[in-house]
């Protein structure tokens, strides 16, 4: 039995799994931007084709997130996570041998599939194992996810340059994914009796609140996918090198990681997370406005503002979804559905930004589009009052379908 007010030493390895799993979910996306010119030259992918390297994984993250509760019920959380991490390792390894655009897109699909399954299942594991520390552990998971993005953006050009081979700059990511799979197989609790997540998902899809959370998560992560796809190429157009533009993307991702870890802690004593969410949205708005108006004035500051806003909002959004329901399986199902619809939405903005770039010759319209999305999310979050959680998820007509269950203490 875990103690109520502290994370016991027995959970140290489980926390290491949380950290290492999170670290592997973004490098394969963020590593492409700094190497975009080399990848495009060898594979023949144009700007819109390169956008598909972000769009395809995001689409798969959305589609397979809906299957997360069913996967967990049928195969178990542990087996699902270990298998997905093995797929991530394989997808990165295969990038050593890519020669065409279709092959590159195939690896993007494989990597997106692996990340999608992990993201769909893992929040439920956090809720189950750390029910009294959901904010802190979700913050750790989100911070490592963002930190992995920084690692991918920074390491890809550094590894590719001495090897004179962009393939190596992307394929190295197979190693930490394999390590995560081995550690997860050893340390995650063995799967027990299937839980109610699959049944809960069907009920939750009837609730408008589920769709509102999807929209908020999707529009915010559309900003993230646009930044990781086009921030480095944007500054390449301003004369920056691959290494320096990749470094800027890494700064953005480091700021994401810090905000994802710290903001849930700062917001932890408040039942109402919306003021903190609005703060993160204000930081995003300032960053995108600066990219549109004065990109060369203080690019490091703009990247840090964007990162802090995006990272904090991601982490707090996950916590808000988990706050809606006390039962880990049901809360995990709501989180998976939010991510499912959200990532389907988030897949489109990078492609739209590429299309607007082709039409206008600039990324300006893409940055302005993100400002409109932020304004929309700011208004939508006004309706996510914690006093409405119970009525929004379990109205009287559905309380028999989705009974309240008590989470195990920790």
Listing of model-derived features with the role each one plays in the protein:
Residues 44, 76, 97-102, 131, ...:
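Helix-breaking motifs and short loop linkers at transmembrane-helix boundaries and internal kinks
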Residues 64-76, 259-272:
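Helix-to-loop junctions at the C-terminal end of transmembrane segments
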Residues 132-136, 140-189:
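Helix-loop-helix hairpin linking two adjacent transmembrane segments in secondary transporters
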Residues 117-130, 312-326:
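Intracellular juxtamembrane helix-capping segments at the cytosolic ends
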Residues 325-364, 370:
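A late C-terminal transmembrane helix in Major Facilitator Superfamily
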Residues 63-102:
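Conserved MFS/SLC helix-loop-helix module at the cytosolic interface between two early adjacent transmembrane helices
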Residues 32-33, 208-250, 255-260:
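Extracytoplasmic gate region of multi-pass secondary transporters
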Residues 107-143:
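Cytoplasmic helix-loop-helix junction between adjacent transmembrane helices
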